[in-house]
């Protein structure tokens, strides 16, 4: 079942969500540019087109008691959670000032100061670890919850079902967030799953409450998050969210991959026509006027320039520290 969520959203929240989407978009675009010019060599999985899923984190889950665990496509989640831009860029550049000390790179971000526990290159790996975090909170009677982000490809891993089942049995305080961008690298849903299968409906049959959003309206996504947060904190039960979304660029890297022909042009055009920024600008044009958008662009551009320049001036880790913070 798709659970409807209706509520009045303040102009302040609308502006905050738009700002975060725009901020993530401009940051990822800058990373794409620097990478294509060989100024960044760490492999990157960009979230351009998918920003509306991460944007509400800055409003609803910024407190450290809400702990995020993410996938290989993690920049947006880290930034949405309140992660430091300078630390992110430093990490991607392999500098000692990075959030993981320059050792993790794009796919292995960690920043406990903001409640961002990890991102991982292993498909579905964030899911069981997030359940462990939630179990720890329950045993210790700590406030807050865990949020596990993963793509549609992760639901084809056995650990996904095992963790959902375990979370239901143990009533864990966890929100599972599936970013369904329709493709696992180059393989679309139709060749990986039975025809017309809906992920949220399938998961709901296991016994977990599930919410769905088509991903075109970031305000609707915010509403689903708010509903999920209240549900988990009040009921002490897990919940599953599926957000349809779309990545504009290649699976890994800074370029378009239209030439590969695995995605129909009309499909790409549809999603770009319904870009999350465009949708908000049209729907809330009185709130998001040109003056405000120009101000946002200038503010974000200044932050990006300062952070990139500072990261470029930062030093690489010393070889003498290569064994520091290694855990086995």
Question: What are these regions, as identified by a protein language model?
Answer:
Residues 116-313:
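Glycine-rich ThDP/TPP pyrophosphate-binding loop and its adjacent helix/strand module
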Residues 78-80, 186, 251, 321:
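Short acidic, gly/pro-rich beta-turn/loop elements at beta-sheet edges
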């Amino acid at each position: 079942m798709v659970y409807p969520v209706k509520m009045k959203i303040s102009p302040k929240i609308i502006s905050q969500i738009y700002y975060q989407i725009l901020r993530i978009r401009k940051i990822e675009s800058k990373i794409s540019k620097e990478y294509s010019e060989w100024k960044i060599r760490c492999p990157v999985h960009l979230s351009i087109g998918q920003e509306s899923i991460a944007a509400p984190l800055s409003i609803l889950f910024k407190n450290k008691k809400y702990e995020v665990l993410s996938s290989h496509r993690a920049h947006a989640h880290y930034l949405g959670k309140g992660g430091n831009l300078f630390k992110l860029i430093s990490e991607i550049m392999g500098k000692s000032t990075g959030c993981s000390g320059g050792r993790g790179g794009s796919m292995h971000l960690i920043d406990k100061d903001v409640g961002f526990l990890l991102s991982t290159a292993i498909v579905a790996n964030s899911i069981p670890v997030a359940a462990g975090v939630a179990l720890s909170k329950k045993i210790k009677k700590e406030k807050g919850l865990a949020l596990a982000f993963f793509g549609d490809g992760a639901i084809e891993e056995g650990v996904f079902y095992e963790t959902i089942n375990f979370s239901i049995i143990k009533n864990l305080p966890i929100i599972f967030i599936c970013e369904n961008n329709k493709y696992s690298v180059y393989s679309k849903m139709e060749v990986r799953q039975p025809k017309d299968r809906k992920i949220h409906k399938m998961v709901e049959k296991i016994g977990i409450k599930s919410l769905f959003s088509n991903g075109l309206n970031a305000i609707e996504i915010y509403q689903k998050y708010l509903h999920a947060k209240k549900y988990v904190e009040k009921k002490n039960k897990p919940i599953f969210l599926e957000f349809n979304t779309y990545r504009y660029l290649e699976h890994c890297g800074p370029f378009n991959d239209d030439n590969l022909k695995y995605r129909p042009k009309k499909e790409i055009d549809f999603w770009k026509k319904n870009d999350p920024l465009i949708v908000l600008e049209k729907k809330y044009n009185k709130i998001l006027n040109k003056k405000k958008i120009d101000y946002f662009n200038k503010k974000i551009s200044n932050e990006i320039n300062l952070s990139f320049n500072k990261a470029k001036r930062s030093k690489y880790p010393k070889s003498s520290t290569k064994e520091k913070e290694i855990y086995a």
